[in-house]
């Protein structure tokens, strides 16, 4: 069934109701926090945010006798927005409840615009972003390239992961092989696995060990199945592909951090159908296409838009084969989607 379009008044009413609910929840949270801080709280200690639930988070103790134990924590009002992967300072209260008093500096931050265009962090302290795609739903180079630009912009190393490799057949193999060849030529690490059959999963595990990783990709590519295969003790529901759209149905409802037995962590985040890049500039996008590095700045005109201008280094690179047409198409699509003031 097609998604019903809402008019401006309906959207306003929905936002008003959601705002009122959020205000009531914040008021209850403030009262609970006052009660906690008025009682006996333990000493300050470091912790790791492993899940976020509205106005509360789950924190894993990182030191002392409680190390490894998980506590549901309230947040002081003066704290910035916390996300899974954040390192924090917190104090334990009674009955497994605690209070977060400070956020520790982040080494990296993965952000994306929300529905209103406001930047929203989705994961912190990640050093490996695993871009997951599959034969079905059909992978799109433009979406993969958006993730790559986001990874380069955030300073996070990317890994391209083709899941459901068992679904490769004579019909889709040529297009998939051509797609993967582009990224392998650029030097990006590419793995082909099947979470369902277990093929390639040990190789994937070795790539994840020792890192804080996040899986990103559109719904239906098997992110939850990958988590279940890597960590069988977890309980991540797997959703089917929509028969109407051929895309996946969302299963994971909150970003959650899991530990690997041999070290390293995995953040499983909700499915993302489209990764907006409205928060980056033209220069950021150009830097995100690594094959452009030696070409940018060498065009005849300083304000070259890399479209039809004479003496354009990118167009010359396209002719010479240094730049692939698929990547140039993605670049132009991303640039066209940027706000005009990003130029």
From Swiss-Prot:
**CDD domains assigned:** YjeQ_EngC
Q: How is the cofactor bound?
A: Binds 1 zinc ion per subunit.
Q: Where in the cell is it found?
A: Cytoplasm
The family database entries (Pfam families) matched by this protein are listed as: RsgA_GTPase (PF03193)
Enzyme Commission number: 3.6.1.-
InterPro entries, sorted: G_CP_dom, NA-bd_OB-fold, P-loop_NTPase, Ribosome_biogen_GTPase_RsgA, RsgA_GTPase_dom
- Gene Ontology CC, one term: cytoplasm
A GO molecular function annotation here is: rRNA binding
Which metal ions or organic cofactors does this protein require, according to UniProt? Answer: Zn(2+)
Keyword Protein biosynthesis recorded:
no
Q: Where on this chain does GTP bind?
A: 163-166, 217-225
Annotated residues that bind Zn(2+) are located at: 299, 304, 306, 312
Protein's GO biological process: ribosomal small subunit biogenesis
The protein's UniProt keywords, in alphabetical order, are: Cytoplasm, GTP-binding, Hydrolase, Metal-binding, Nucleotide-binding, Ribosome biogenesis, RNA-binding, rRNA-binding, Zinc
Instruction: Give start and end of each CP-type G domain.
Output: 116-275
Top enzyme category: hydrolase
Q: What does this protein do?
A: One of several proteins that assist in the late maturation steps of the functional core of the 30S ribosomal subunit. Helps release RbfA from mature subunits. May play a role in the assembly of ribosomal proteins into the subunit. Circularly permuted GTPase that catalyzes slow GTP hydrolysis, GTPase activity is stimulated by the 30S ribosomal subunit.
Q: How does it assemble?
A: Monomer. Associates with 30S ribosomal subunit, binds 16S rRNA.
Task: Family membership, please give it.
Answer: Belongs to the TRAFAC class YlqF/YawG GTPase family. RsgA subfamily.
From the Swiss-Prot or TrEMBL record, give the protein name.
Answer: Small ribosomal subunit biogenesis GTPase RsgA
Query: Which organism is the protein's source?
Result: Pseudomonas savastanoi pv. phaseolicola (strain 1448A / Race 6)
Q: What is the lineage of its organism?
A: Bacteria, Pseudomonadati, Pseudomonadota, Gammaproteobacteria, Pseudomonadales
Q: Which gene encodes it?
A: rsgA
């Amino acid at each position: 069934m097609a998604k019903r379009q809402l008019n401006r008044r309906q959207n306003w009413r929905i936002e008003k109701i959601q705002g009122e609910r959020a205000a009531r929840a914040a008021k209850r949270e403030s009262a609970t926090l006052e009660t906690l801080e008025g009682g006996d709280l333990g000493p300050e200690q470091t912790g790791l945010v492993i899940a976020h639930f509205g106005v509360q988070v789950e924190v894993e103790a990182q030191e002392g006798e409680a190390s490894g134990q998980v506590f549901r924590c309230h947040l002081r009002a003066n704290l910035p927005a916390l996300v899974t992967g954040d390192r924090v300072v917190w104090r334990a209260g009674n009955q497994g409840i605690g209070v977060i008093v400070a956020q520790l500096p982040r080494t990296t931050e993965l952000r994306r615009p929300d529905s209103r265009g406001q930047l929203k962090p989705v994961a912190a302290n990640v050093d490996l972003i695993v871009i997951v795609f599959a034969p079905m739903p059909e992978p799109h180079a433009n979406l993969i390239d958006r993730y790559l630009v986001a990874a380069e912009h955030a300073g996070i190393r990317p890994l391209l992961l083709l899941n459901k490799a068992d679904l490769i057949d004579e019909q889709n193999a040529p297009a998939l092989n051509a797609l993967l060849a582009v990224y392998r030529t650029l030097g990006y690490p590419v793995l082909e696995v099947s979470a369902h059959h277990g093929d390639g999963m040990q190789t994937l595990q070795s790539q994840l060990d020792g890192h804080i990783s996040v899986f990103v990709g559109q719904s239906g590519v098997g992110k939850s199945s990958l988590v279940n295969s890597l960590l069988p003790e977890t309980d991540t529901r797997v959703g089917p592909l929509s028969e109407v759209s051929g895309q996946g149905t969302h299963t994971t409802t909150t970003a959650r951090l899991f530990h690997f037995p041999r070290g390293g962590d995995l953040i499983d985040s909700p499915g993302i159908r489209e990764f907006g890049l409205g928060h980056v500039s033209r220069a950021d996008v150009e830097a995100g296409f690594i094959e452009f590095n030696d070409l940018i700045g060498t065009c005849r005109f300083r304000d070259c838009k890399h479209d039809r201008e004479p003496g354009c280094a990118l167009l010359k690179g396209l002719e010479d084969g240094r730049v692939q047409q698929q990547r140039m198409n993605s670049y132009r699509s991303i640039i066209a989607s940027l706000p005009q003031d990003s130029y």
